[in-house]
């Protein structure tokens, strides 16, 4: 006599139990990872969009959830906070000198941190432009116009803000090329800072001073901040003046090794920064008015970003280490010329 066949109902029950067990195992193995990205002042919108995209990508790839927390402020001040103990898994700062300080002062990243990702670990670029009020009432056309007596210039403090250091060096580099000497460039930049009524700690603070508080005739702005000011504070209230020359700003990113090793987040942190170089990451940069590194993605934004002559920090100043020591260290050129 043959044993009775298993009924279809029993088979369905067994299959359901197996699926439930697999689902429970998958749920149990999935985890939630938290990262802290310590960034500079005007990247809030960029990383709000990027964090959501990366979370979707990582969930699809691994099944794990990622929650990315953000901290924003002047780049130099943010670097100091990380040195003083802020537990950043990654830093996305305004300039290489600030990440260099994490190595030099606290040993949080290796000396060769900049070689670990493409493009010297700078996944997007920007520059410094001049934002003026509607109708350009002070007839500002180029750098020379902002050093005229009586023109009020808004720019953050280069001791705390990365954007301010880029702006300072953009003005210096323009003047040295136009007038032919470092002495003339120093006079030019000194005249510029005589026109600065207040130094905010970061770029976003300066944008608010100019756009909301309506202080100043011209804002020395990150290019993305100029776009955002026109978008967020009312169309037609401001105009962007593209100078004849400016500096190629290359904001870098890095995993903070000592933190991720302790927290066990190294793999996710690396993937997070690597995803900035993906097509989606590059497109998000472009949508937020940062210049993509990818040539293919950059072509899609060719009509957005104006063409202008750009010089690099290496060409004009011998790199960030030399520029930081000469101009922004205690007792450096900025301290000597800024008499407030």
Name each model-derived stretch:
Residues 22-27:
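N-terminal signal peptide c-region/cleavage motif recognized by signal peptidases
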Residues 30-160, 309, 338-339:
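N-terminal segment of the mature folded domain
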Residues 38-40, 113-123, 132-134, 152-178, 192-196, 230-247, 259, ...:
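Short beta-strand->loop
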Residues 128-136, 250-267, 284-288:
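A bilobed periplasmic-binding-protein/Venus flytrap-type ligand-binding module shared by bacterial periplasmic
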Residues 135-141, 160, 173-181, 259-267:
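Short helix-loop capping/hinge motifs at secondary-structure junctions, enriched
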Residues 178-244:
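Ligand-binding pocket segment of bilobal, Venus flytrap-like solute-binding proteins
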Residues 260-340:
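Extracellular/periplasmic juxtamembrane helices and adjacent flexible linkers that interface
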């Amino acid at each position: 006599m043959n044993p009775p066949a298993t009924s279809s109902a029993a088979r369905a029950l067994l299959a359901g139990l197996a699926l439930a067990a697999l689902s429970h195992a998958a749920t149990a193995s999935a985890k939630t990872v938290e990262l802290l990205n310590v960034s500079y002042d005007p990247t809030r919108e960029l990383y709000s969009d990027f964090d959501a995209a990366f979370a979707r990508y990582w969930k699809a790839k691994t099944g794990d959830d990622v929650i990315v927390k953000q901290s924003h402020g002047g780049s130099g001040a943010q670097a100091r906070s990380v040195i003083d103990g802020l537990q950043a898994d990654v830093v996305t700062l305004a300039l290489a000198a600030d990440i260099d300080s994490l190595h030099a002062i606290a040993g949080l990243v290796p000396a060769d941190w900049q070689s670990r990702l493409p493009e010297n670990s700078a996944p997007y670029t920007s520059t410094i432009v001049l934002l003026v009020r509607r109708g350009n009432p002070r007839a500002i056309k180029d750098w020379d116009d902002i050093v005229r007596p009586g023109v009020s210039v808004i720019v953050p403090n280069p001791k705390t803000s990365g954007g301010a250091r880029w702006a300072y060096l953009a003005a210096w580099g323009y003047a040295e090329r136009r007038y032919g000497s470092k002495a003339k460039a120093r006079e030019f930049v000194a005249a510029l800072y005589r026109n600065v009524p207040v130094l905010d700690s970061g770029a976003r603070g300066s944008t608010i001073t100019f756009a909301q508080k309506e202080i100043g005739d011209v804002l020395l702005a990150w290019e993305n901040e100029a776009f955002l000011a026109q978008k967020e504070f009312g169309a037609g209230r401001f105009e962007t003046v593209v100078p004849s020359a400016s500096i190629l700003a290359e904001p870098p990113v890095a995993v903070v090794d000592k933190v991720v090793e302790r927290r066990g987040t190294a793999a996710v942190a690396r993937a997070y920064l690597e995803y900035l170089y993906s097509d989606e990451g590059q497109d998000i940069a472009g949508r937020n008015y940062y210049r993509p590194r990818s040539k293919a993605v950059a072509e899609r934004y060719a009509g957005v970003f104006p063409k202008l002559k750009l010089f690099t920090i290496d060409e004009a100043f011998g790199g960030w280490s030399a520029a930081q020591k000469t101009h922004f260290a205690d007792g450096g050129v900025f301290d000597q010329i800024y008499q407030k």
